[in-house]
A protein has these predicted regions:
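Loop-rich non-cytosolic ectodomains and luminal regions
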Residues: 1-194
Length: 194
């Protein structure tokens, strides 16, 4: 809300002095599929619907993090390694087709412990939230995958995909963590969560 108020203030000043205005803004936020940003987007639309009002935005602003991955139909799998300066990693997967999540937690850097969870298992779990607790290399991890419909495309299901631990200050740095989506019949996008 503070961003939008700042934009309005700047545009009001530009209107007052009779000048067009371009605001350059570095967002730094993750993707939203649950509707949290709908009202904010409506405010931005109303501010930029006036001729001479332009907002240029840079999303992400965290070049060191993996922000997006796409596995198209026909490709069996796609994946990446994940880490964070916190004790958890959080991504959002989105697809209209069923697929399999593979989360691998490595003992050190070479011995993976893979956990496979299907999207159907998540949807069938109580509250569409699937939990797995496991120990790898003496460290306790919790895998949580929760499902909900995309507010923008109701035929697509979004999955909050989280791995957390209290045993690592910076998850994925001593024991590597990889995310993989599998299933040749599914088109899956994965976004970094906030």
């Amino acid at each position: 809300a503070m961003d939008a108020l700042g934009f309005k203030y700047i545009f009001d000043y530009a209107d007052k002095v009779g000048k067009p205005c371009v605001i350059s803004f570095s967002e730094g936020a993750g993707q939203d599929f649950d509707g949290e940003d709908v009202l904010y987007n409506e405010v931005l639309d109303s501010l930029t619907s006036i001729p001479g009002h332009v907002i240029v935005s840079s999303a992400g602003n965290n070049g060191h993090l993996k922000y997006y991955m796409h596995k198209p139909v026909g490709k069996e799998s796609a994946g990446f390694f994940a880490n964070n300066s916190r004790s958890y990693v959080y991504h959002i997967a989105k697809s209209a087709q069923p697929f399999t999540f593979r989360t691998s937690i490595y003992e050190g850097k070479t011995h993976p412990t893979p956990i496979d969870v299907t999207s159907e298992q998540v949807l069938e779990a109580p509250d569409s939230t699937y939990f797995v607790n496991l120990v790898v290399a003496g460290k306790q991890y919790e895998l949580i995958i929760g499902a909900y419909p995309s507010v923008y495309h109701p035929d697509e299901i979004c999955y909050d995909w989280i791995v957390k631990t209290d045993d690592e200050e910076k998850i994925g740095t001593s024991n590597y963590i990889s995310y993989q989506t599998m299933g040749a019949d599914a088109d899956v996008e994965v976004f970094h969560g906030s």
